[in-house]
UniProtKB/Swiss-Prot annotation:
Entry keywords, A to Z: ATP-binding, Cell cycle, Cytoplasm, Nucleotide-binding, Nucleus
A GO cellular component entry from the record: cytosol
Record family assignment: Belongs to the protein kinase superfamily. STE Ser/Thr protein kinase family. STE20 subfamily.
Protein name per UniProt: STE20-related kinase adapter protein beta
Pfam families: Pkinase
Length: 418
């Protein structure tokens, strides 16, 4: 059976499952009413892209990233009938073993069914010979990880962190309500559109708590995670014992991601897996700026002044000269302070005991996100450089797509990860 033969093309809505009741008495002092969020329907132009499965309708512009253990190339492309910029993920299915094929199949199916503004959408999926093409909206700001590398090497401001985490946790809450564990929450799986919309990607790592119509309290699926993912994983997932893990494992990853956004570095990145597990198990939750859990470096990166980080690669924008940016606008003080509310959120997420961590729904009601009621979606745009999202801007010359004959670059050199 083909990878694409297993799901219905009617785009049936998945009915949300009732989440388990959680005990949150220990965090009530930090909770407020949950903010609301509206979502508009896709534009007519986007609807045309949704229906386009003709490979000749897409002009590949430039590769903007790698993913899926370096088996997938991610390209900026233009949908020629409408002029819409899109993202295309191209994977050679012949290079995928059975486990990877199942992961791809799962990601395609679940993205097809999920309908939430904070979950990355697959507009169209089709095959070109043995190559799988996945068409998604172009996220002009790329990933939060890319923003860190290019503009915020010493970490983001608390206001920007709040905007990014709020969208990510809303998407995560939707997944949890539908009985799914993401298992790969991190900055490189948080994408930002040119309109300031934050979405979660990385659905190939997702696992369902529902089996045979029953929602289980824990799962015992322990895949061979890439070492690049392990710093974000919870202690219970790394332990791989008889207790298993559940959706609270993702909450731990949210806490690590918050530390990543605050410091500009990935906690535990240079540690051996055993040392990492011991470090995560040994004591109380970590501070977002606890230097003992971050890789040591003799020198820190400086804010880039060479071009706008648009999500298509800084070198492309430098050569084309389409934008410039005022570095003062993106300046982050080297001596940063964070509010008690932010420290509280991180500490709650990083509790060793999963039962002591809040649910995603409760996390959205944390006082740290209270200001999101007053802030509009445009507020995140005021904290970022101008986005590269106008189809009228000239792009590098394109060539017809052909099957690659050379080896791909190392995944570690890529800023985008899907």
């Amino acid at each position: 059976m083909s990878l694409l033969d297993c799901f219905c093309t009617s785009r049936t809505q998945v009915e949300s499952l009732r989440p388990e009741k959680q005990s949150e008495t220990s965090i009530h002092q930090y909770l407020v009413d949950e903010p609301t969020l509206s979502w508009s329907r896709p534009s007519t132009r986007a609807s045309e892209v949704l229906c386009s499965t003709n490979v000749s309708h897409y002009e590949l512009q430039v590769e903007i990233g790698r993913g899926f253990d370096n088996l997938t190339s991610v390209h900026l492309a233009r949908h020629t009938p409408t002029g819409t910029l899109v993202t295309i993920k191209i994977t050679n299915l012949e290079n995928c073993n059975e486990e990877r094929l199942k992961a791809l199949q799962k990601a395609v199916i679940l993205s097809h069914f999920f309908r939430h503004p904070n979950i990355t959408t697959y507009w169209t999926v089709f095959t070109v010979g043995s190559w799988l093409w996945v068409i998604s909206p172009f996220m002009a700001y790329g990933s939060a990880s890319q923003l860190l590398r290019t503009y915020f090497p010493e970490g983001m401001s608390e206001t920007l962190i709040r905007n990014i985490l709020f969208g990510a946790v809303r998407g995560l809450n939707y997944l949890h309500q539908n009985g799914c564990i993401h298992r790969s929450i991190k900055a490189s799986h948080i994408l930002i559109s040119g309109d300031g919309l934050v979405t979660l990607s990385g659905l190939s790592h997702l696992h369902s708590l529902v089996k045979h119509g029953q929602r289980h309290r824990a799962v015992y699926d322990f895949p061979q995670f890439s070492t690049s993912v392990q710093p974000w994983l919870s202690p219970e997932l790394l332990r791989q014992d008889l207790h298993g893990y559940n959706v609270k494992s993702d909450i731990y990853s949210v806490g690590i991601t918050a530390c990543e956004l605050a410091s500009g570095q990935v906690p535990f990145q240079d540690m051996h897996r055993t040392q990492m597990l011991l470090q995560k198990l040994k004591g109380p939750p970590y501070s977002p700026l606890d230097i003992s859990i971050f890789p040591q470096s003799e020198s820190r990166m400086k804010n880039s002044q060479s071009g706008v980080d648009s999500g298509i690669g800084e070198s492309v924008l430098v050569s084309s000269g389409t934008h410039t940016v005022n570095s003062d606008r993106l300046h982050t003080p080297s001596s940063k302070t964070f509010s008690p509310a932010f420290f509280s959120l991180v500490q709650l997420c990083l509790q060793q005991d999963p039962e002591k961590r809040p649910s995603a729904s409760s996390l959205l009601s944390h006082v740290f996100f209270k200001q999101m009621k007053e802030e509009s979606q445009d507020s995140i745009l005021s904290l970022l450089p101008p986005a590269y999202n106008k189809p009228s801007i000239s792009l590098p010359p394109v060539l017809p797509w052909t099957e690659p004959e050379c080896d791909f670059p190392d995944e570690k050199d890529s800023y985008w990860e899907f």
